Curated annotation (Swiss-Prot):
PANTHER family: PRE-MRNA SPLICING FACTOR, TPR-CONTAINING PROTEIN DDB_G0280363. Residues 19-85, 153-195, 296-334, 447-477, 576-687, 706-728 are annotated as: Disordered. Residues 296-306, 448-465 have a biased composition (Polar residues). It comes from Dictyostelium discoideum. This is TPR-containing protein DDB_G0280363. GO terms for biological process: mRNA splicing, via spliceosome.
Length: 1304
């Protein structure tokens, strides 16, 4: 090398070094800022808490560092000659015995014995840093950056001289890797030195958990990835630990010397022409920006790598512009480029030859290797237009290979694939020849495959398009032939053919992976023009393809229309032929009619002879029908086969897999019966269509069969059933009408009727029956019976197949006491809707009300031929009918039959259990409940029934009951679990186990939803009140008031007022009820409680006043009228009768009012009237228990103490009453059955009732001041006339709360 060349080379290198140094400083400042942001975010997530103090200290030190940059630049040369000792900042863990400092990393290896002696010092509460150490840190960073810059300069020059210009991107990456691996080499060569790391991120990464680590000094050993050196410096997983021995200055000098030696060795290797193996990680230093911290990659790595690439590209451009070569290896690179160009030319020639061969094979195998739809399958996504125009521009436009066949193309596919340029040329050749396919998605064996759309150029003529249309028609014909053949193939054969075609075409069409070169980034203007022309051609080709697709769709539609017309003509011809045959058969049967009195054998022979004669006389006619049927069957089979093949090919494997489990599910019993019924009807019609032989008999059954077979007109019922379906538009119109009609109702009946009649002209006919139904209801509420009947008749005439009209009409007649007319209406409705469950149940109950059990059983007998799965609800009503009639054995058989055939319906087991419980057969009831729980373990009511039964049969031993609670908790859903614990708490309360009851309430609170917690607090308050813990009960009521919804607040206020009354605070109770009158004005129970409060306090005048004020607001509350009747007994019988008559005008169906009328009749010794009134009371309100007790008293007065009350017990069992003052007085326990309460009432009546004669003798006028009856009769004076304060606590609670049991 000459002196001038060496001088120019050294001068250029100095200039480049200065520029690189300037750029590197700017980059370092940016990188440091970004690193600081990253460390702040990372440490906030890692440590949290008091990290802001550390961050402020770092910012302050950074400002000092920027001020000292100029001074440091001047001292760089001195630092290179005499480097200072740089020490990485560390966390200091001060041990009491020995000074052990851990730089950063994992603390899992510290011994447990050392934990107590380790003090973690981290800035304030978190960590601590020395300012001197931070200054050393900044100096250390600058020192290593300068070394890296020098290393970059040398390596860039050498690598640019050695490598080709086409591989600039690789060289940039190699330089980065060289620099990255240099540090690793330095660190690996020095076994006894500590790793001095840049601790911007790592200095705060300290694991919070400390596990066993043993330390030793003076020997090299590894324990759990812990290395200990001879110089006293140990490392844990690559992290240095200083044990206090050794000099850091000497180690740094050694490191610097070793780094300089490595640099010299790398330069010597480059000068010798050796290639650097980038796979070796020990060559160059690994920069901090690309490190991973605790598995998290640094965010600055991408920024630094981009900046380095830009700098290296600028250097290379400058080096290219220099006239003199930098290294003697430049000429060798030119030779290598020439050799590469020659090799590329040879490859292109070989590829052109392969293209010609492939095109010939492609044309020959297009018809063979097409899919079922005639479309080639290619296992890749479609290439974008940019990729077709210039495939070497960007890899983002390249087609993506299919993931389904990734195992086939996973290796080096250079031999199996062709170049992208050849692929583009092949597409152009295909467009010029016109051999293209439409782009479509076709489902192959392994998934969706794309077939490319290679369209002809814009220069194609109309003749060419016509030829293409003809080719497509030919292909369709070939497809039809192929599909007919493919039907008879097995699924495996079809799969094999599809996969073979796919594998063949994928090797031809699939492009290889694209390798980008740097020359492709620079495009000539000529190439750009070519790209624009190609894009324009592609757009025109797309438009042309759309036009062709539209033409093909129009042709397909025309063909389908022609096929439909032909099918219709064939069907018409068949119908005409059938009609002619039927007419001929009828004429011949009329001739043979006199021979009808012969035996059945002769009649069959005659029919056979007639059929033979008909077949002989018309052989051609029969053959024609058979041929037509055969052709129809063949066409139908072909269509079905084509559809099956298309669906199998178009559906993806995932969809087929999702459909397979649905097909494998067994059909339900209802579906099986429907399938059998449809199969039978289809078989009958197919046989008649194929044979055209109708065996005609003159019986009525055969005539009905002929009407169904000959497709005669449907009966009028069927024509009107089609009108039941209402469109969404008609429903929306009806909703709009109802809103306006409700507003017109308030103005009056006439205005509403006028509006309704006007709306009939606008509304559709399908909705007219609903309008008439609303008008009938309005007339009924206005007590216009005649008008209501007219409208109901209009409803039943327009839509007789809707049960709602019949039910409303029958209910109106029943309300007016016309039971016979109601019966006729229900019978007429069942003729039109014979198997409607609501009509059947209503009819059965009405027949039972009329004491016509035979009529009810006759209605049930109609269901004999019907499926149990459609009529099981009506059958269950029949079982309840027999149970109410006292036929217990028949009812048990019916329920047993239902439990066998409908085991999945829980209410069947519930009704069967109630039947056995009413009969006091508790063991049978338990067996039924357990059987039901086995079939449906998540049905909650059965679990509550089981708890009730086990508590009844426990006799104080609750082990089985508690086991049932645990079973129920595991079986039911979480929404019901809190109710199980609530019931368990009440069970424990009744057995006097308050601790267990409170524990169960606590569990109920834990599992109860927030909107229902008030019920648990209310139940707990009632429990504490029964235990006379009034303070705790009051607190729980307050808690319930806080959480109860506003709509149910009145219930909690009632509980609060009763609690204060029980505690003796009557005035406070009155104030609470007054507040409840304002908040819950619509709740009549609040007003009734005010009346009862005054009655219990013996303030009868105030009670009468409260009752009259309450009736002004709630005139429809029967219990308020009953209380007013009781209070007017003090004023005499006449006043009582006047109130009774007035009450019947407002509440004619109130059982409480009729019961008070019966008491008035009993006091006046009018026993017949009393019995009649009590029957009304039981009929209208069967839940009111006082009616049954008064009826029992009437029976004892008439028939004596030894009277038979079995019918009364059965009546009481069927009604199952649950409230009433006298009823609750006779109830000993909540678990008592209706029969047990009635027996208790009889005992009390016999003990307290005097004989009838004495009763009549002692009846005096002054007894009118009594409540009901004399003192010796069980009457209300036991409840009210006694002083409330003199009662026991149990009697007070019974009088206060009555039947209001808190239920979950």
């Amino acid at each position: 090398m000459n002196n001038e060349d060496s001088l120019s080379y050294s001068f250029g290198r100095m200039m480049l070094n200065q520029q690189q140094h300037h750029h590197q400083q700017q980059n370092n400042t940016q990188v440091q800022q970004q690193q600081q942001q990253h460390t702040t975010q990372f440490n906030q997530v890692r440590f949290g808490g008091n990290y802001h103090q550390q961050h402020q200290q770092q910012q302050h030190h950074q400002q000092q560092h920027h001020q000292q940059q100029q001074q440091q630049q001047q001292q760089q040369q001195q630092q290179q000659q005499h480097p200072q000792q740089y020490i990485s900042p560390t966390f200091s863990y001060v041990h009491n015995n020995s000074n052990t400092s851990i730089t950063h990393g994992n603390l899992y290896d510290i011994d447990d014995n050392q934990i107590d002696n380790v003090n973690i010092i981290r800035g304030g509460n978190r960590g601590y840093y020395n300012q001197q150490q931070q200054q050393h840190q900044h100096q250390q960073q600058q020192y290593y950056h300068e070394q890296q810059q020098q290393h970059f300069n040398i390596n860039n020059n050498n690598n640019n001289s050695n490598n080709n210009n086409n591989n600039n991107n690789n060289n940039n990456n190699n330089n980065n890797n060289n620099n990255n691996n240099n540090n690793n080499n330095n660190n690996n060569n020095n076994n006894n030195s500590s790793l001095i790391t840049n601790s911007h991120h790592a200095q705060r990464i300290v694991s919070p958990i400390v596990n066993g680590m043993t330390s030793s000094s003076g020997s090299n050993m590894m324990i759990n990835d812990v290395s200990f050196g001879m110089n006293g410096i140990s490392s844990i997983n690559g992290i240095s630990i200083n044990n206090g021995s050794g000099d850091i200055d000497e180690e740094d000098d050694k490191l610097l010397d070793e780094q300089q030696q490595l640099l010299q060795r790398s330069l010597e290797r480059l000068s010798d022409g050796e290639e650097i193996s980038f796979g070796n990680p020990n060559y160059f230093f690994h920069p901090f920006s690309e490190r991973n911290i605790n598995g998290l990659p640094s965010t600055n790595s991408s920024i630094v790598s981009r900046q380095q690439q830009l700098q290296q590209q600028q250097q290379k451009l400058k080096l290219k512009s220099s006239p003199s070569p930098i290294s003697p290896f430049f000429y060798t690179q030119q030779q290598q480029q020439q050799q590469q160009q020659q090799q590329q030319q040879q490859q292109q020639q070989q590829q052109q030859q392969q293209q010609q061969q492939q095109q010939q094979q492609q044309q020959q195998q297009q018809q063979q290797n097409t899919s079922i739809n005639g479309i080639i399958k290619i296992d890749q996504t479609p290439p974008t237009p940019q990729y077709i125009a210039n495939p070497s521009v960007s890899p983002l436009n390249a087609p993506i290979s299919s993931p389904v066949l990734g195992d086939i193309y996973s290796g080096n596919n250079n031999n199996n694939n062709i170049n992208t340029n050849n692929y583009r040329q092949q597409q152009k050749l295909n467009t010029s020849t016109g051999s293209y396919q439409n782009m479509s998605f076709d489902a192959g064996v392994n998934g969706f495959n794309w077939s490319p759309s290679l369209q002809p150029d814009q220069s194609t003529s109309t003749n060419h398009t016509q030829a293409m249309l003809q080719q497509q028609q030919q292909r369709q014909q070939q497809q039809q032939q192929q599909t007919q053949n493919l039907v008879y193939l097995n699924n495996q054969q079809i799969k094999s053919t599809v996969t073979s075609n796919r594998d063949h075409w994928s090797s031809v069409v699939k492009p290889p992976p694209i390798q980008l070169q740097q020359n492709s980034m620079q495009q000539n203007p000529i190439q750009q023009q070519q790209q624009q022309q190609q894009q324009q051609q592609q757009q025109s080709l797309l438009q042309h393809q759309q036009m062709l697709q539209m033409q093909m769709q129009i042709q397909q539609q025309q063909q389908q229309q022609q096929q439909q017309q032909q099918q219709q003509q064939q069907q018409q011809n068949q119908q005409q032929n059938q009609q002619q045959n039927q007419q001929q058969n009828q004429q011949q049967n009329q001739q043979h009619y006199p021979n009808q009195h012969h035996g059945q054998h002769q009649h069959n022979q005659h029919n056979q002879h007639h059929n033979q004669h008909h077949n002989q006389s018309h052989p051609n006619h029969k053959n024609q029908h058979q041929k037509q049927n055969q052709t129809q069957q063949s066409t139908q089979q072909q269509q079905q086969q084509q559809q099956n093949v298309q669906t199998s090919t178009t559906q993806s494997p995932l969809l087929q897999q999702s459909q397979q489990p649905q097909q494998q599910q067994p059909p339900t019993s209802n579906q099986r019966q429907q399938q059998q019924h449809n199969n039978n009807t289809n078989n009958v019609t197919t046989i008649n269509n194929q044979t055209n032989i109708n065996i005609i008999n003159n019986d009525s059954d055969n005539e009905e069969l002929l009407t169904t077979v000959n497709h005669s007109k449907p009966p009028p019922n069927e024509s009107k059933r089609g009108e039941l379906v209402e469109s969404p538009v008609s429903k929306q119109q009806y909703k709009h009408f109802i809103k306006q009609f409700k507003l017109k109702e308030k103005e009056g009946l006439e205005i509403a009727m006028e509006f309704a009649f006007q709306s009939l002209s606008v509304l559709p006919e399908k909705v007219h029956w609903r309008v008439y139904l609303e008008l009938a209801d309005l007339a009924n509420r206005q007590n216009n019976l005649k008008l209501a009947r007219k409208f109901y008749r209009k409803v039943t005439s327009t839509q007789p197949y809707i049960s709602q009209g019949w039910l409303e009409y029958a209910k109106m007649e029943e309300d007016y006491g016309r039971l016979e007319k109601c019966q006729k209406i229900l019978q007429l409705g069942l003729k039109h809707c014979p198997f409607n469950e609501s009509l059947l149940i209503k009819g059965i109950r009405h027949e039972e009300k009329m004491d016509n059990l035979e009529g009810a059983r006759a209605l049930l007998s109609q269901l004999r031929d019907q499926s149990i799965y459609k009529t099981w609800r009506a059958v269950m009503e029949g079982g309840l009918l027999e149970a109410r009639a006292g036929n217990i054995d028949v009812a048990r058989k019916i329920f047993k039959y239902l439990m066998k055939h409908v085991p999945w319906y829980g209410p069947i087991y519930q009704e069967a259990y109630k039947l056995e419980e009413r009969c006091e057969e508790y063991e049978r009831a338990i067996n039924i409940v357990e059987k039901g729980l086995f079939e449906d373990p998540k049905y909650g009511p059965l679990w509550f029934s089981a708890l009730r039964l086990y508590e009844k049969t426990s006799h104080g031993f609750l082990q089985s009951t508690r086991n049932t609670v645990e079973r129920a908790r595991q079986a039911v859903s979480r929404e019901v679990t809190w109710k199980i614990y609530f019931e368990a708490a009440q069970i424990e309360e009744r057995s006097k186990n308050l601790t267990l009851s409170r524990a169960a309430y606590v569990k109920s609170v834990e599992l109860c939803p927030e909107n229902l917690l008030w019920k648990v607090w209310l139940g707990g308050s009632r429990t504490e009140l029964n235990a006379d813990n009034i303070c705790i009960a009051r607190k729980l009521v307050f808690r319930a008031l806080e959480e109860v919804p506003s709509k149910l607040r009145s219930l909690v206020l009632l509980e609060y007022s009763r609690l204060e009354e029980y505690a003796g605070n009557i005035n406070k109770s009155r104030r609470i009820l007054k507040m409840a009158h304002v908040e819950a004005r619509l709740d009549w129970k609040v007003f009734l409680e005010s009346v009862l409060l005054e009655m219990r306090a013996n303030n009868y005048e105030a009670a009468i006043k409260e009752a009259k004020e309450s009736l002004k607001i709630h005139s429809g509350a029967g219990r308020l009228w009953a209380a007013l009747i009781q209070l007017n007994q003090l004023k005499g019988v006449k006043s009582q009768l006047n109130v009774f008559k007035k009450a019947l005008q407002f509440v004619p169906k109130s059982g409480e009012v009729w019961c008070e009328g019966a008491r008035i009749a009993l006091n006046n010794n009018e026993l017949r009237e009393a019995r009649r009134f009590l029957e009304f009371a039981i009929q209208f309100t069967p839940q009111f228990g006082d009616s049954f007790i008064e009826l029992l008293r009437l029976e004892i007065m008439e028939k004596g103490p030894n009277c038979d009350i079995s019918k009364l017990e059965q009546l009481c069992i069927n009604a199952d009453p649950n409230y009433g003052f006298m009823w609750l007085h006779c109830t000993v326990c909540v678990l008592d059955s209706s029969r047990q309460v009635l027996r208790n009432a009889k005992k009390l009546l016999l003990e307290m009732t005097q004989p009838k004669e004495q009763y009549l003798e002692e009846k005096k006028p002054e007894y009118g001041s009594c409540w009901v009856g004399s003192d010796g009769v069980l009457s209300l004076n036991r409840v009210f006339r006694n002083d409330f304060n003199n009662m026991s606590n149990q009697e007070k609670r019974k009088a206060l709360f009555g039947s209001d049991v808190v239920k979950p």
